[in-house]
């Protein structure tokens, strides 16, 4: 039995199981994450250099302990959300980084500058006594910094992602931690071996391979100098090298390249650069040697590590977003606001011009129509006066008077409505402002009264206590008993509520920008590597705000999982909604409710599994039942012989079909239906189709299987039912859409279907043809013709009678409708009169409330302004009133917009103007505008002046295009006639023949 385990097949299966297990995956990811070496490893590698230090072993132990505790905290933060947020927020990073750098600076530079102000003797002594604790803190804090500030390696992030994807999280975490431990032990051992080999190599060579022709005087003095101020000297030398390099580049790209080349060769710039580079290399290798030779250079090595750490920070912080808001972004926002305001003002002016033009055109048309109407009216009056001068009926005069009265009332109602619409808005706005001011003033007055009353109460209590020392009374009890104070407090609370209601806005979804985001913007995207201009006319590059790899939890397969490409804007919006709804409705939207919605509740996954199991069981049982029913009922004859209701209608699955949602009976034809496939797809009978026709002669038959329609006449219900069933069954038997339709037969159809089935399944017996004489056939045909002719005559008479009846009914309906219209118009006029009276009364009442008695309110001033901004002078009003005969009131905003554009929909459908607002999206762009060296030179020669260039390009040379002779031949002359000097035109010639991969790169990226 034991030998069977070592068979190759079993070994392969065991290996496959181990590879697919969570433990092996965790070990693999943990082992990989150990090799992602970052800046935090520098503290582990530093004591390996300092073996001669007496406290080296203790420092190693403290640094490894801090390293492992930091990693443990990071592992805990993966599974514990608040800790992860605390370590990842910029506020906590700032609180950790600022004091860390300050104390690190004091501790490292305490003995180097004894005469300067950076030396704090009390602090330095306490720090030196606690050196091991400081080493522990250094290594621990660097692990926490590497989570957010320093670059997080990709290999460690893979393990974090897999935790969310795995089912057994604890097993994976434990196994990955074990793998990480094994990997770190191997890395440390390997580093120790490498350093021992380096030591042997350096001792064997003893720096013989570094030689220099130029003598460096007083090397010991230089080393002592660097020991005292190593960092400052190195920074100075780096800056000097940069200055030399920039000077060389400028000289190289200048126009006097040939003249200055001899100076570069003769000068000692290049040799000086070589000496500096050799000196730095020699200094570093001398440090490696002196660590093991003597203890003098130990401090220099510590300074070297601090320089490397500083370089790491500069590297990582250059690519991270700024912790404060960019002032250029604020300028851009102000510019956008100003541009939007100017665009809105232009659009408003254009709208006003269009509206004024249309209003003037309407006014001209109205004047022309009025002139024509006046001329026609005069002619009609003269003719009627001459024709009917003798005989005048009192009824006609009264009717004319009634019409004039109705028109006058209509005009009066229109005028009053316009007055009310214009004045009511102004009055209401003024009333609201006056109410707010009055409420605030009353609130301040009540507060002053309340303070005075409280002082009086305190004085009275003191007097009572002096007069009656046996029964002391507290001021709080006196305040509670005093009714004046209670009344004042109630009034102040009512006024505060009133002010809040008047100045209230929809605060449910108004997400205000907090103060912290102005200082810290963690969602601000990083600076790009290359500066790519998308369009020729666009000045600034487009900003990619949508992150391609944003991780956020989402629901998948009934479980909360990690989504790799979740939109960050949606995630922040969801979190803001949670906060707002939880603050507004804390009882309804609890934590359990949000977890259930997101799918992270503890019992949600079990519920999902149980639901899926139930669905699976129900589907399997249904499938088994269908197979059993199909096996039992093998043929249609057995079903019909038993005379039992067929259950095969529920055996086959009814498919979804497209229909009209209003009637739910109008289905698409089977050819055009995308849901139907298989045998039904592409086969249809013109006589058999689904549809609805709402006529008197055609009726539709709908069965359970969406069967067909048949044309029937006006008959009884019982006859109709029988004929419907017969026709539907015949159509299915003759022209079946699918053979399975033959199985769907009800019990009530059995007597009709039985003879058909017997004919189909019975023996084929030849039938004798009945012979009829020709004379009888002719007689039958003649009788049929006579019957048809009589039927036609009867039908024609019936149609004539029906048409006459319809005409009579239509006339009666017209008379009734006219009577009803007259009554409704009279009622509407009365209602409008009552409404206008009530509105005018309200306006007068509000005027009396707001304005004092001495002030008068003019509802119709001489110069009036519409809500849309059009001004009407008194001259235009007088002209219009003289032409029309009644006083003019300028139309409202509603009348100008809607009455000008709305037309009759039946006649002029194409002339209707649709006012549509264009939805514009502002493309996010970078706040800065980067330029290259060529653009910088062009701007320096022209009017625009740019700052220093920040984009790399190929080395180029400017070549002049024209000569002085050509300029003299073709002189330039201004508009005034003065001669103008020719501007020099240059052509750019790029010197790099090879492909330059640095082209388009941003400096510092």
Swiss-Prot record:
Keyword Nucleus among UniProt keywords: no
InterPro entries for the chain: TIC214
Membrane topology, record value: Multi-pass membrane protein
Gene Ontology, cellular component aspect: chloroplast inner membrane
Annotated compartments: Plastid, Chloroplast inner membrane
Origin: domain of life: Eukaryota
Compositionally biased tracts (Basic and acidic residues): 811-824
Start and end residues of each stretch annotated as Disordered: 457-481, 767-833
Residue ranges, compositional bias (Basic residues): 783-810
Principal location class: plastid
Stated family: Belongs to the TIC214 family.
UniProt protein name: Protein TIC 214
Source organism per UniProt: Oenothera berteroana
Gene name tied to this protein: TIC214
